């Protein structure tokens, strides 16, 4: 579903838990970098180019970012609800705890090629 939203241009942003980047000593996404978007069966759906990357506390993610994520009713309330659940699960798997002031990596992108 999410990959399809990206391919049709409905989803032009995503967010990740910053503590997971720290834990894995992984670099943040870079503006100008390309990524292959995969569906739930690991099939390539499209190629995206990162256009913006910024880090903000979870409780400061904007309604504009939530809208660009293109999920649910596109509201900030919906975004917070599903991402708090998702981040809590991901963090608990590695022994970390979600907090509302946790840093979030916000990434915006454009589709450059359909697969």
Q: What do these predicted ranges mean?
A:
Residues 31-38:
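Loop/turn positions that initiate beta-strands
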Residues 45-54:
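Short beta-strand-centered aromatic/proline hotspots
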Residues 1-22:
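Compositionally biased, charged N-terminal/linker segments
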Residues 23-28:
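Short, surface-exposed secondary-structure edge patches
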Residues 70-115:
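Contiguous surface segments at macromolecular interaction interfaces
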Residues 56-67:
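Short, solvent-exposed secondary-structure boundary/capping segments
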